[in-house]
Amino acid sequence: MAARRGALIVLEGVDRAGKSTQSRKLVEALCAAGHRAELLRFPERSTEIGKLLSSYLQKKSDVEDHSVHLLFSANRWEQVPLIKEKLSQGVTLVVDRYAFSGVAFTGAKENFSLDWCKQPDVGLPKPDLVLFLQLQLADAAKRGAFGHERYENGAFQERALRCFHQLMKDTTLNWKMVDASKSIEAVHEDIRVLSEDAIRTATEKPLGELWK
């Protein structure tokens, strides 16, 4: 009998919303509860494409905006065989940023439509759950200054947030808003409950394709 597939769970949100912390805590909690769970993070900086992106994000190199958008998408596509293999083996994948960040951060630049931004990622594995960690940008800034990488400034984050809200109107995706202004443990508990439900539901349906 084939293993029940794992769930694909994505955490999204503005910088400083707590995605990385909550992603780690979720994997730990799921494993402690007897699930097989692993963490993925995008961009995946260890690949050749990922190294290019890391250099770009650290402002060590410049890449034309359309080109870098396609590189971010390629960085996701090169992980698709691994994603599909893990899910088919019954491993739940918790993903810190996915295509939605890619679309929102390019869409926040001038003269990019969300429709154009989405096209390279059409057909990626479709998440069973997309958790959006909702936090006012003023509250995010109180958690420490935004970092020094490209895109890490308040004005840009504001434009990206508007793009995220446009993406969340898509009813074909299982978006769940999480109040990230609460304590780390309270946010974790909200995420854990939603994720356990997604894992149960995922076993009953095949893996979908994003934006198709």
Swiss-Prot record:
Its annotated pathway?
A: Pyrimidine metabolism; dTTP biosynthesis
The kind of enzyme this is, by top-level EC class, is transferase
Question: PTM N-acetylalanine: at which residues?
Answer: A2
Please describe, based on the UniProt annotation, the reported consequence of changing A99T: In CONPM; uncertain significance
- Which Enzyme Commission number(s) are listed? 2.7.4.9
InterPro entries listed in its UniProt record:
P-loop_NTPase, Thymidylate_kin-like_dom, Thymidylate_kin_CS, Thymidylate_kinase
**Binding of ATP: at which residues?**
R16, A17, G18, K19, S20, T21, R97, K182, R192
Task: Quote the catalytic activity from the record.
Answer: dTMP + ATP = dTDP + ADP
Task: Give a yes or no for keyword Kinase in this entry.
Answer: yes
Residues modified as N6-acetyllysine: K169
A GO BP annotation? thymidine biosynthetic process
Quick one: a GO cellular component term?
cytoplasm
Which UniProt keywords are given for this protein, alphabetically ordered?
A: Acetylation, ATP-binding, Disease variant, Intellectual disability, Kinase, Neurodegeneration, Nucleotide biosynthesis, Nucleotide-binding, Transferase
| Region (LID) residue spans | 133-157
Q: Which family does it belong to?
A: Belongs to the thymidylate kinase family.
Concerning PANTHER family, the annotation shows: THYMIDYLATE KINASE
Binding partners and assembly: Homodimer.
* Primary role: Catalyzes the phosphorylation of thymidine monophosphate (dTMP) to thymidine diphosphate (dTDP), the immediate precursor for the DNA building block dTTP, with ATP as the preferred phosphoryl donor in the presence of Mg(2+).
Q: Which disease is it linked to?
A: Neurodegeneration, childhood-onset, with progressive microcephaly: An autosomal recessive disorder characterized by global developmental delay apparent from infancy. Most severely affected individuals have severe and progressive microcephaly, early-onset seizures, lack of visual tracking, and almost no developmental milestones, resulting in early death. Less severely affected individuals have a small head circumference and severely impaired intellectual development with poor speech and motor delay.
What is the protein named?
Thymidylate kinase
Say which species the protein is native to: Homo sapiens (Human)
Species lineage, top-down? Eukaryota, Metazoa, Chordata, Craniata, Vertebrata
Gene name of this polypeptide? DTYMK
